[in-house]
């Protein structure tokens, strides 16, 4: 055999190695066949060519041996004479298999080798020869780059020893059946940091330390290898994963070269921790999640999530089994143990929540898969809205909760796993104190398994969607990790719900541990490599976090602040710029407002006249209203551009962050800015100045108005200032040169006209357009105009306003009202305020101007022209004469109304009228302006109305005032707030008819003249606005504005009361609706406004009309009721005034056209819907809200929370002798034009005296005959109203029943108190709903039981 060996070597030109072979014990050819590439260096074969020849020789010998086997020649077992290799037994299988022996096994075998002489080979020589062999075997394979890791010195020996001692190759690794296949070459590839992911980083191992990893690292990446399953072993799957040590992992990937040569690509990965199949969940927990527990007890947050392919062991790791609990259970035990051990932590409790993310949606697994929503709080921390949290006091209970949730989780069969998790499950364990304040939080996330679409078997559409969503979310997670690793300014956390929920796991004071789970099967090699590469990417992030920790920490605006979040932080340093998020109407967001009151940068709109200055008030963007705490002087005469800017930017609302936006907005609405400035300026001084600038800024009214809160005391103190402020609102700061605002620029006018026209068309529903017929109203207005003119002459209000200012303000108002109505409908309260303020400013400002110094004929004419233009543009069909008349009245009415609006609709004004209100309020008192708009329906409806509507409102007010001059004056003039308010209210209630409105306006104006500041406030509220009206109005406006559409809101908000309680009371009584309007000059005025506005403003906004319409019926009813209900001046009005009101009422039918009525009713419903939200407030919405709400809708009543008919004043009125209510209800309920007409007629008919009369709640003085005469409602209509109300009540009750059932199903013993609270709320709503329906039924019965039922029906 030796000769044969020598001959073979000679044939292969390797004869020179024969002596060395024999010296090492190679005597036979069969023994030579056992030589592996690893033995070449030991055999002395170092030359690459010789090695090739030796390899070919061995290959031929093996082929011959296999041929002998095939011929049946018995194979003599080879002795392990070769020191290099020892035959290994391998399991045969149906397919080619890869058998890899672990390095430790190789070492053991080598140790048992007969020859130990090879140990004298130096390690260096072995390494060099080994590398040469690899290079020789695959010299041209660019894919196989042999990257030998240069381990630390401490690990060099062991690592190298492993590589050299383990047989590099063994034929046993490959199927012996493939005799003619070349022996594969193993290529080792080390995946160091940066490998295949971009720029390589130096791979520096962290020196092991006894300290927990949480003290040194932000993210820890571990890998866990599961063992082969029984089924996998049965199928013959091979383990291709080798865990070399606790940080190193090898993956043996079988590959095939282009020439069909098979080779093994050995991937080497390094991680913070590698767990083999022998590791238990306890072992994994101690190295991963255990250090996180101490971190959360230190006040931090922690996340531990498992990632990997379907079936890799993620769920087992995180949730585990009853015998081998998962990480969350082990963590819970640790938490409870620490809570018991530490005395200082005895007052802490453990809360658990469990939800999943399935197909991009969140579901609560502890609450019957209730749909959840992920939102960010003010600190940009993600909160899960609606998530059910359970308090657990033991690990057993916690395990039961998790078990319950696990049963609800979405799972499904896939091609890889029969029970695969198809959703991401998040178990959140929180530590809270007795006040339920979160002390620490740890989340365990079991991610859904990633998979390839090619692996899916028999997948239907749902399965494909699941897989796509899972992969998309995991990809988004990878993108977030990449962005964080590369320190991008933007991290796409919102690309998926998963990343949104996990956002806090990667930023801020959060520690994260990722456990990559892998399967050992060779079939899953590709999945395993993808998982390991993914984890390696996170490991790089971990390293990057250390480097950029300072960058992350430097943004400490919040505990969890990302660079992006920090950049967008709402807090702006003085002088810092904050670009608005939105640019409105092409306005440039060039205006930057610094917190400092004086520091402001303003860039005029392209359309804005450059000469119009922006002023900043002392108010800082961060403050809601600098005037709030500051004395009036702060606002005095300060033409601070900033104020206007701030207001525009809604700085009051949003604070410093909004300041930038405010700047932009203020640019957009310089008029608004001016209004704010006016407010800022002393109410008395700045009125004129502010108004003047307002003209110049009217282009900017397009911008939404920001609310400014003024202290109620200041408002009360400076009622007059309030009015002046309103005017000043309209105008620019007193400090600004009036000439800049004196001459409106053509561009501004065109802009205003365009915006007005656009908003009118945009906001008017086709129904309203068809029904609008303002001719009659205009005629009425014209008829009443004389009285208004008289009133004007009589009531020279000491308002400081320039006709120019007024004009500017008017134009501005028009634009603002239009724009605010259209685009700044925030509850329409802001727009309404803006409109109202503009309208008020316009009419009010001009009115103030007139009052200040009675407008010269020229000024009045100019104002009228503006008003007419606006009205005509807005109303279209309206007659110019009426408009002009209205406007001519407007100055007075405006002033009154402006003052009234300010005082009585502070809330409304505050939100939407913020500039007006702020100016007024700022002068008098910032807090008066709180966010609530005055309830004044006039103001509100004006705001919501287009500028035309505002004019109409003004006209109505003026008409009402002029018509009821004596009464109004009497009541208004009376110093008592009640008188002032009550009279206007009654007039307002009556204001449904232009005459009535005029009357009210006149008295109000006169009163205002007598006590401009006080009367308007009183008019706005029963008591002077300064006293209670501000708060009430604010509340009302807040409710109305938030809940209603811009127009509807304004109408609803318009009604303002001196006292919310009084308003609520009135609403409860059923008079509240009308009462509010009346008090504010709203329901009635608002209602009246509907009539007027229907003529003048209907074109502007059907919604506004609707509000008015709804207000007027309720107003009528409430008006009657109001006197009885509240101590408001309306009630106080003596019956003698009632006749006058009745007269006004008679006029009202004329004022309100049927079309208007119908449209109002239509809008009213819409309003009601909106109001419904506001009405829902536990406290009854201000009557103005009620007024805005359709009285016929039961929902409103219940929502309003005033079952008495607050929601449905008309119902209450029905209860009262007033015959109006039933018919009103029908008309309001009916969307048909006839019904509206009837309602309008009723409104016209309804006796103002009722509203004004304080003696009788329903003012019986209004005869049912008169009501019937004016607005007869047929019994059929009344029945229809009742039927409809009953149906609505049934629907609402059904909805409440459903809520109650849902609440019962969700009842939890741990939260029984909360359950009782919610149940009580539901019962209260039911009670209100029932009471509302009963009110309507009683009203119907009172109207139809008497013999004179027809009359009452008509009235109703």
Curated annotation (Swiss-Prot):
Binding site for ATP: 308-315
Tissue: Expressed in brain, spinal cord, and small intestine.
Biased composition (Polar residues): 552-571, 830-840, 970-979
Basic residues: bias regions: 640-653
Keyword Coiled coil tagged: no
Domain of life of the source: Eukaryota
A UniProt-annotated Pfam family: Kinesin
Biased composition (Acidic residues): 810-821
Region listing for Disordered, in residue ranges: 93-119, 552-581, 597-664, 788-840, 897-947, 964-998, 1109-1140
GO cellular component, as recorded: centriole; centrosome; cytoplasm; microtubule; protein-containing complex
GO BP of this protein: cilium assembly; microtubule depolymerization; microtubule-based movement; negative regulation of cilium assembly
Span list, region Interaction with MPHOSPH9: 473-702
SUPFAM superfamilies for the chain: P-loop containing nucleoside triphosphate hydrolases, SAM/Pointed domain
Record PTM Phosphoserine, positions in chain: 102, 473, 579, 616, 640, 817, 820, 1008
Domain Kinesin motor: 218-541
Subcellular location: Cytoplasm, Cytoskeleton, Microtubule organizing center, Centrosome, Centriole; Cytoplasm, Cytoskeleton, Microtubule organizing center, Centrosome
Similarity remark: Belongs to the TRAFAC class myosin-kinesin ATPase superfamily. Kinesin family.
Quaternary structure annotation from Swiss-Prot or TrEMBL: Interacts with CCP110, CEP97, TALPID3. Interacts with MPHOSPH9.
Function, in words: Microtubule-dependent motor protein that acts as a negative regulator of ciliogenesis by mediating recruitment of CCP110 to mother centriole in cycling cells, leading to restrict nucleation of cilia at centrioles. Mediates depolymerization of microtubules of centriolar origin, possibly to suppress aberrant cilia formation. Following activation by NEK2 involved in disassembly of primary cilium during G2/M phase but does not disassemble fully formed ciliary axonemes.
Name of the protein in question: Kinesin-like protein KIF24
Gene that this polypeptide is encoded by: Kif24
């Amino acid at each position: 055999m030796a000769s044969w060996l020598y001959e073979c070597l000679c044939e292969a030109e390797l004869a020179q190695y024969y002596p060395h072979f024999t010296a090492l014990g190679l005597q036979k050819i069969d023994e030579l066949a056992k030589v592996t590439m690893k033995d070449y260096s030991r055999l002395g074969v170092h030359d690459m060519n010789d090695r090739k020849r030796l390899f070919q020789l061995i290959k031929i010998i093996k082929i011959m041996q296999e041929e002998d086997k095939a011929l049946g020649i018995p194979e003599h077992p080879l002795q392990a004479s070769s020191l290099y290799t020892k035959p290994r037994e391998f399991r045969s299988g149906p397919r080619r298999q890869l058998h890899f022996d672990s390095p430790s096994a190789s070492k053991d075998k080598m140790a048992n080798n007969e020859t130990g002489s090879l140990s004298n080979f130096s390690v260096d020589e072995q390494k060099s020869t080994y590398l040469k062999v690899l290079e020789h075997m695959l010299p041209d394979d660019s894919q196989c780059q042999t990257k030998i890791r240069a381990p630390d010195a401490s690990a060099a020996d062991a690592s190298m020893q492993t590589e050299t001692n383990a047989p590099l190759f063994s034929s046993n690794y490959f199927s012996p059946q493939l005799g003619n296949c070349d022996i594969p070459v193993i290529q080792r590839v080390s995946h160091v940091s940066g490998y295949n992911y971009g720029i390589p980083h130096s791979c520096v191992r962290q020196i092991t330390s006894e300290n927990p990893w949480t003290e040194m690292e932000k993210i820890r990446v571990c890998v866990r290898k599961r063992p082969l399953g029984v089924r996998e072993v049965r199928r013959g799957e091979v383990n291709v994963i080798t865990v070399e040590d606790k940080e190193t992992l090898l993956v043996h990937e079988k590959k095939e070269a282009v020439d069909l040569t098979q080779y093994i690509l050995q991937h080497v990965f390094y991680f913070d921790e590698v767990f083999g199949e022998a590791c238990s969940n306890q072992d994994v927990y101690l190295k991963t999640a255990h250090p996180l527990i101490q971190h959360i007890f230190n006040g931090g947050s922690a996340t531990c999530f498992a990632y990997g392919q379907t079936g890799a062991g993620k769920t087992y790791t995180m949730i585990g089994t009853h015998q081998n609990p998962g990480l969350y259970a082990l963590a819970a035990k640790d938490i409870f143990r620490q809570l018991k051990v530490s005395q200082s932590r005895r007052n802490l409790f453990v809360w658990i929540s469990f939800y999943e993310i399935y197909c991009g949606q969140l579901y609560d697994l502890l609450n019957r898969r209730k749909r959840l929503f992920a939102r960010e709080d003010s600190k940009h921390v993600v909160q899960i809205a609606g998530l059910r949290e359970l308090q657990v006091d033991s690990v057993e209970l916690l395990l039961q909760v998790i078990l319950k949730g696990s049963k609800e989780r979405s799972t499904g069969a896939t091609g890889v796993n029969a029970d695969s998790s198809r959703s991401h499950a998040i178990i959140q364990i929180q530590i809270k104190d007795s006040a339920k304040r979160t002390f620490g939080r740890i989340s365990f996330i079991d991610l859904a398994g990633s998979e390839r679409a090619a692996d899916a078997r028999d997948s239907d559409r749902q399965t494909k969607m699941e897989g796509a969503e899972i992969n998309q979310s995991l990809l988004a997670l990878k993108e977030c990790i990449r962005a964080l690793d590369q320190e991008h300014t933007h991290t796409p956390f919102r690309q998926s719900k998963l990343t949104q929920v996990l956002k806090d796991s990667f930023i801020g004071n959060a520690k994260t541990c990722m456990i990559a789970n892998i399967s050992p099967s060779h079939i899953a090699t590709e999945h395993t490599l993808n998982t390991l590469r993914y984890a390696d990417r996170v490991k790089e992030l971990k390293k990057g976090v250390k480097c950029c920790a300072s960058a992350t920490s430097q943004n400490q605006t919040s505990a969890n602040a990302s660079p992006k979040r920090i950049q967008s932080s709402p807090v702006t340093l003085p002088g810092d710029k904050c670009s608005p998020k939105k640019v409105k109407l092409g306005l440039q967001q060039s205006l930057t407002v610094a917190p400092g009151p004086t520091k402001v940068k303003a860039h005029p709109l392209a359309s804005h006249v450059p000469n119009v200055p922006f002023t900043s008030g002392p108010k800082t963007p961060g403050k809601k209203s600098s005037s709030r705490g500051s004395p009036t002087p702060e606002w005095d005469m300060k033409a601070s551009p900033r104020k206007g800017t701030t207001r525009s930017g809604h700085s009051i609302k949003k604070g410093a962050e909004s300041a930038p936006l405010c700047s932009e907005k203020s640019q957009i609405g310089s008029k608004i800015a001016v209004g704010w400035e006016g407010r800022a300026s002393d109410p008395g001084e700045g009125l004129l100045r502010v108004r003047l600038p307002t003209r110049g800024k009217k282009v900017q009214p397009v911008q939404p108005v920001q609310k400014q809160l003024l202290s109620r005391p200041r408002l009360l103190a400076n009622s007059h200032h309030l009015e002046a402020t309103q005017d000043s609102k309209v105008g620019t700061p007193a400090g600004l040169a009036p000439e800049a605002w004196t001459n409106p620029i053509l561009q501004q006018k065109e802009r205003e006209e365009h915006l007005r026209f656009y908003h009118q068309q945009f906001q008017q529903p086709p129904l309203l357009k068809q029904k609008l017929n303002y001719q009659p109203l205009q005629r009425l207005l014209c008829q009443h105009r004389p009285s208004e003119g008289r009133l004007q002459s009589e009531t020279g209000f000491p308002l400081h306003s320039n006709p120019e200012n007024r004009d500017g303000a008017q134009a501005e108002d028009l634009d603002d009202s239009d724009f605010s109505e259209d685009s700044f409908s925030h509850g329409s309260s802001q727009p309404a305020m803006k409109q109202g303020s503009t309208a008020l400013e316009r009419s009010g400002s001009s009115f103030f101007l007139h009052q200040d110094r009675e407008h010269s004929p020229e000024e009045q004419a100019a104002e009228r022209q503006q008003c007419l233009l606006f009205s005509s543009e807005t109303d279209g069909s309206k007659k110019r004469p009426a408009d002009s008349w209205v406007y001519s009245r407007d100055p007075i009415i405006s002033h009154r109304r402006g003052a009234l609006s300010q005082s009585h609709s502070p809330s409304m004004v505050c939100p939407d009228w913020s500039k007006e209100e702020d100016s007024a309020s700022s002068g008098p008192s910032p807090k008066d302006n709180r966010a609530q708009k005055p309830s004044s329906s006039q103001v509100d409806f004006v705001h919501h109305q287009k500028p035309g509507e505002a004019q109409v409102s003004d006209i109505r007010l003026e008409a009402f005032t002029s018509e009821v001059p004596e009464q109004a004056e009497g009541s208004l003039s009376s110093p008592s707030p009640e008188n002032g308010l009550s009279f206007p209210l009654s007039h307002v209630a009556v204001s449904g008819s232009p005459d009535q409105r005029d009357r009210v306006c006149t008295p109000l104006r006169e009163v205002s003249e007598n006590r401009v500041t006080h009367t308007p406030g009183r008019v706005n509220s029963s008591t002077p606005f300064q006293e209670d009206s501000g708060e009430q109005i604010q509340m009302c406006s807040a409710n109305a504005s938030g809940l209603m559409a811009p127009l509807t809101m304004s109408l609803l908000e318009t009604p303002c009361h001196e006292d919310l309680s009084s308003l609520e009371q009135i609403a409860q009584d059923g008079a509240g609706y009308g009462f509010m309007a009346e008090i504010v000059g709203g329901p009635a005025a608002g209602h009246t406004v509907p009539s007027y506005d229907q003529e003048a403003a209907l074109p502007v906004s059907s919604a506004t009309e609707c509000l008015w319409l709804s207000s007027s019926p309720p107003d009528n009813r409430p008006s009657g009721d109001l006197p009885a209900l509240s101590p408001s001046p309306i009630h106080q009005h003596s019956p003698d005034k009632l006749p006058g009101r009745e007269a006004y009422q008679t006029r009202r039918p004329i004022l309100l056209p049927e079309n208007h009525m119908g449209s109002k009713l239509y809008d009213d419903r819409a309003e009601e819907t909106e109001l419904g939200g506001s009405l829902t407030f536990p406290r009854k919405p201000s009557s103005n809200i009620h007024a805005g709400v359709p009285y016929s809708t039961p929902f409103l009543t219940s929502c309003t929370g005033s079952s008495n008919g607050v929601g449905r004043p008309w119902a209450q009125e029905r209860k009262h002798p007033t015959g109006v209510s039933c018919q009103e209800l029908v008309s309001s309920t009916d969307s048909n034009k006839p019904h509206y007409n009837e309602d309008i007629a009723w409104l016209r008919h309804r006796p103002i005296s009722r509203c004004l009369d304080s003696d009788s709640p329903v003012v019986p003085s209004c005869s049912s005959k008169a009501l019937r005469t004016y607005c007869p409602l047929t019994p059929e209509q009344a029945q229809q109203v009742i039927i409809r109300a009953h149906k609505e009540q049934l629907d609402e009750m059904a909805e409440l029943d459903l809520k109650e059932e849902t609440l019962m199903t969700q009842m939890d013993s741990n939260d029984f108190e909360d359950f009782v609270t919610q149940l009580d709320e539901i019962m209260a709503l039911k009670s209100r709903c029932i009471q509302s329906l009963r009110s309507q039924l009683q009203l119907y019965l009172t109207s139809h039981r008497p013999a004179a039922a027809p009359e009452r029906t008509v009235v109703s």
